[in-house]
Swiss-Prot record:
Its main location: secreted. GO terms for cellular component: extracellular region. This is Pregnancy-associated glycoprotein 2. Keywords: Aspartyl protease, Disulfide bond, Glycoprotein, Hydrolase, Protease, Secreted, Signal, Zymogen. Disulfide bonds join C107-C112, C268-C272, C341-C376. It comes from Sus scrofa. Glycans are attached at N56, N79. It comes from the Eukaryota. Gene3D superfamilies: 6.10.140.60, Acid Proteases. The gene is PAG2. Residues 76-417 form the Peptidase A1 domain. Transmembrane segments: none annotated. GO terms for molecular function: aspartic-type endopeptidase activity.
């Protein structure tokens, strides 16, 4: 088997390290099973894109603010260790943020009690950086302090690595999450000031030949997914990698040419932006564009689906019981983006065109079945439109399960190829 370094396609034998990822139940699924999702969404309205675009306003004085893009659907986790001797943690390898953080033993919040926590006094290599940090999320907050220690990711070792330790975590999303913390893989420009990102530290310490990493997200229920550092393994994709230049070096953001269905443009008609994000499960887009997609789904499968923006105009349905009226409003009887499961076979591909290359997403991918109630849901979700009206999409795991993705920080580009 030949390992390839992205920049020069030079054969490697020792430089590529692969970390297995496990697909676990998302926070959204956990909340839905417990009947908590509806109230949670009411209590925590979230503007994903506005948080993404406000990154530069987050670093104020000695605090660092970093938004988490999708607070319910982080489902692929891997293991790392911190300290000497190593303390183990399960983290999300997240291309939408740049910092590493885990809970600390000083955190007594409910979210921390249910997760593993780092004990600085048990590590001979720990150093307190003497800086407070505060991470703001759509679903809550994490506050703590900055430390540094030895971080091990598989066979890779990052010494003197800066990371956050939480002292307080609020929000049900943290309480119900399977993961302990987050390992950010975005650019240094959105990291805590004065710190070096994990990927840059690995390169600086010659642990990897190039600042390159790649994701293969398996469609299997649990095992088979990997994140690889320093190169790629060709067995995880078919054909050649198609390279896409970044439009900015903060998040992994690229230009999206258009979105089509059976040759008809249904989104991004004049070109727009897309963020490729392993920390997001769904396909997120502007509300009008997503409504158009769901209208098309309704047209093709002919029944049951109602555009969400129609709920405001629909009347109450009234049940009269023992001469007493019990109205049920449309907000209750129209669930969000429910699709008959048998419609998946009839629905067409939705095609994302990136850098003049078509990337089809079939209905089997964008219509997901919930194992608990056998209902199917569209994985297209709308986000609040931003003040500047820029059309931005988030290509999450629905897209990344179909396409093997390489993140090349050295040349500021993303490589895409059909996953095996």
């Amino acid at each position: 088997m030949k390992w390839l370094v992205i920049l020069g396609l030079v054969a490697l034998s020792d430089c590529l390290v692969m970390i297995p990822l496990t697909k676990v139940k998302s926070v959204r699924e956990s909340l839905r099973e417990k009947g908590l999702l509806k109230n949670f969404l009411k209590e925590h309205p979230y503007n994903m894109i506005q948080n993404l675009l406000s990154k530069n306003s987050s670093h104020v004085q000695k605090f660092s603010y970093q938004p988490l893009r999708n607070y319910l659907d982080m489902v692929y986790v891997g293991n790392i260790s911190i300290g000497t001797p190593p303390q183990q943690f399960s983290v999300v390898f997240d291309t939408g943020s740049s910092d590493l953080w885990v809970p600390s033993i000083y955190c007594k919040s409910k979210a921390c009690v249910t997760h593993r926590s780092f004990n600085p006094s048990h590590s001979s290599t720990f150093h307190d950086r003497g800086k407070s940090i505060k991470l703001e999320y759509g679903s809550g907050k994490m506050s703590g302090f900055l430390g540094q220690d030895t971080v091990r990711i598989g066979q890779l070792t990052s010494t003197g690595q800066a990371f956050g330790l939480s002292k307080e975590e609020t929000g049900k999303a943290f309480e119900h999450a399977i993961f302990d913390g987050i390992l950010g893989l975005a650019y240094p420009s959105i990291a805590i000031k004065g710190t070096t990102t994990v990927i840059d530290n690995l390169k600086k310490q010659d642990q990897i030949s190039e600042p390159v990493f790649a994701f293969y997200l398996s469609s299997d229920k649990e095992e088979g997914s990997v994140v690889m550092f320093g190169g790629v393994d060709k067995k995880y994709y078919k054909g050649d990698l198609k390279w896409v230049p970044l439009t900015q070096t903060s998040y992994w953001q690229i230009a999206l040419d258009r979105i089509t269905c059976r040759g008809r443009v249904i989104g991004c008609p004049r070109g727009c932006q897309a963020i490729v994000d392993t920390g997001t499960s769904m396909l997120h887009g502007p509300s009008k564009a997503v409504a158009k997609i769901h209208s098309l789904i309704k047209h093709f499968e002919k029944e049951y689906v109602v555009p969400c923006n129609a709920r405001k105009a629909l009347p109450d349905i009234v049940f009269t019981i023992n001469n007493v009226d019990y109205p049920v409003p449309a907000q209750a009887y129209i669930r969000k983006y429910v699709v008959p499961c048998n419609a998946r076979k009839a629905l067409p591909d939705i095609v994302f065109t990136i850098n003049n290359v078509d990337y089809p997403v079939p209905a089997q991918a964008y219509i997901r079945k919930n194992a608990n109630n056998n209902r199917c849901y569209s994985t297209f979700e709308d986000i609040m439109d931003t003040l500047n009206q820029r059309e931005i999409w988030i290509l999450g795991d629905v897209f990344l399960r179909l396409y093997f993705t390489v993140y090349d920080e050295g040349q500021n580009r993303i490589g895409l190829a059909q996953a095996t």
